[in-house]
Amino acid sequence: MIFNPVISNHKLSHYIHVFCTFTTFCILGTETRQAITALSTYTPAFVTAPTVLWSNCSSCMLMGIMQSLNAYTWMKDHQVLFLGVTTGYCGALSSFSSMLLEMFEHSTNLTNGNIANHTKLPNRAYGIMEFLSVLLVHLMVSMGSLIFGRQLGKEVIVAYGSSSFSKPYTPPSDTVKENAGDVDTQEMEKNILEFKFKTPAPFFKKFFDIVDKLAYALAFPLIILFVVLCAYYENYSRGKWTLPCLFGIFAGFLRYWLAEMFNKTNKKFPLGTFLANVFATLLIGIFTMVQRGKKHFSTDVPIVNSLNSCHIVSALISGFCGTLSTISTFINEGYKLSFINMLIYYTVSIAISYCLLVITLGSYAWTRGLTNPIC
């Protein structure tokens, strides 16, 4: 069953709606991830910073809530909004490539803090424990957040926010598809067969309408705003707050296109999301090598040794790579697969991505060495 929105009889109007809404949520998701990372970076922190753990947790919880709302047909009149929040916002808020980079840096003792303080593991075998620590904490927190979000949406929001039962609902058959990995059509069909269609209370309908219209209207103003800010301010904000959001737009659409093109090829292995995550991890390894790799073995000067270039590389790492890869869709897809297929999907994705980091960033770190970036 293909689940698509009914926005307008004119396809151009619909595509503009999708483009604007998706763009807005990609910008907001990238900016939120940057803000949460900055907020969670302090000393002494229980969760060692910098990390995308908080962002991944938040995005998976929101993804779970949206899955429940959509499964009970709450989003039947707002499918473009659903696409924007799940694939756009949650996808940009979470980051698979950043998680893999954390995993690599901790397991190889190459974090910025360890290099600056000359911190060493008791022996190299402890790298295995560091690898498992990052992997298990991220995956378990993300999966737990998704399950909690789904139950919160089902048992609280849908249960207490529905005004009445609605008539049986037949989804339209054009545009936004399940292939993006964020539409659970099986659960939706099950609820339809069991006559579990619910109508959200007027407050929620109005809220969805307002958010949908705001997302539609804010796309181009936000693009113009960030372009102007990026051009005017040449300080650290260019690499941390402005450029990442602009790069995130292109990354978000690339991820969505890959999912639309390739996820339908194999229902047991979401190939589109896999390609997006692996490609983003390869790029983040290369960009990190350029930003932190020593120019010469005998000096601590990095390859990128100008402040402006360093900010641009930082924006590519957090904006393009961070948004191109996603944990929320990755976890949600695994949740919908059988347990064995989920293990295969997760293992192959993580193993290949980690090996790419070893080949790119690791080989340079162990021959020339890494240093801290200048920005």
UniProtKB/Swiss-Prot annotation:
Reactions performed catalytically: fluoride(in) = fluoride(out)
Q: Disrupted gene: resulting phenotype?
A: Highly sensible to fluoride, but not to other halide salts. The growth of a double deletion of both FEX1 and FEX2 is inhibited at almost a 1000-fold lower fluoride concentration than in the wild-type. Has increased intracellular fluoride concentrations.
Intervals, Cytoplasmic compartment: 1-11, 56-79, 149-213, 263-268, 332-338
Q: Which Pfam families does the UniProt entry name for this protein?
A: CRCB (PF02537)
- State any single GO MF term: fluoride transmembrane transporter activity
Q: Which residues lie on this side of the membrane: Extracellular?
A: 33-34, 101-127, 235-241, 290-310, 360-375
Bilayer topology term: Multi-pass membrane protein
Q: Where in the cell is it found?
A: Cell membrane
Question: One GO term of the cellular component aspect?
Answer: plasma membrane
The task this protein performs is described as: Fluoride channel required for the rapid expulsion of cytoplasmic fluoride.
What more the UniProt record tells us is: Present with 220 molecules/cell in the plasma membrane.
- What protein does this entry describe? Fluoride export protein 1
Q: Which gene encodes it?
A: FEX1
